[in-house]
Amino acid sequence: LIAAINNISFKKLLLGSLFLHLWATYFSTGFQHFDEHFQIIEFLNLKWGGIKEAQLPWEYHDKIRPWFQTFLYYWLSAPLKLLGVENPFFYSWYYRFLTGLLGWSATVYFMNLLKSWFKEEHLQKWGFIILNFLWFAPFVHVRTSSESLSISLYLFGTIIFLTKKEMRSFFIAGLLWGFTYHARFQMALPVAFVWFYALFLEQRNLGRLIYSALGVLVAIGFGTAIDFWGYGEWSFSLWHYYRTNFIEGRLAGSGHAPVWEYVRWGVFRGIPPLSLVLVGITVWGWVKMWRHPLTWM
């Protein structure tokens, strides 16, 4: 079986991965988490005039939600609206298709890093297979969630940052990271760790970090303008997120868990015993290859 897989061409692997993603866009229904619908799709529904502001959740009224993802869906579906397409189920599929296509493209683009990390072609293939053919990968990629969009943008930005040499490429990486941040604020942390890796382990030229930081700032500026489009007034959603969750204490209602709880979730929600292998290999990699960029990503 392993020999047969090693003989499969990259083209067939790409087509197989694309097929699984398209399959997932059609057979996925509903939402994985309430936020995926009520804080993205319903915000979009407001712009289309299908719902009133009073019907939206408290996150809208407290202005803690960035509008970047909703803005993308709005303009990408505008031509269909002009053509008279009104079926909400079609739009649900369409947004899954767009998000899934971006996620698939990000993992395909990840081959640039795999080829620099592994010189043997069969190892490159197995890296691609793990990224694309684990049962949860296509499902996660097609979700219209902030997690899915932000991870795809983050991968594009990180791959450009780690593989390109031109200064403009670092600026583009920063733009993608800035939009990653506007898709999901928490993604600022992995971006910071890529910077730490570049600064302390690779000892890259500080100018490259500055160019990427400028890209982040420009993207944040665009994101702030998009929030104005969404809320109808100037608003800095990150501040409101911090204010409501950490000063006013709304976050307390969602429960607390220690960091190591993610390990337990990974084991029990990732379908044992395969999840035990995945978690074990990940922890082993962090310990044995702590200087590798993948550890810092």
Give the ranges of each region predicted by the language model.
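Start-transfer (signal-anchor) and selected internal transmembrane alpha helices
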Residues: 1-23, 214-216
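Extracytosolic helix-loop segments that constitute the early lumenal/periplasmic catalytic or substrate-binding loops
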Residues: 20-26, 37-64, 68, 72-83
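Membrane-interface alpha helices of multi-pass inner-membrane proteins
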Residues: 22, 26, 135-141, 157-161, ...
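Short acidic/glycine- and proline-prone juxtamembrane loop motifs at membrane-interface regions
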Residues: 33-35, 139-149
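Transmembrane-helix motifs of polytopic, lipid-linked glycan transferases
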Residues: 93-119, 156
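Transmembrane and membrane-interface helices of multi-pass
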Residues: 101, 114, 122-136
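Specific aromatic-rich, kink-prone transmembrane helix
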Residues: 105-112, 130, 136-137, 149-175
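Membrane-lumen/periplasm interface segments of specific transmembrane helices
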Residues: 180, 185, 190-280, 293-297
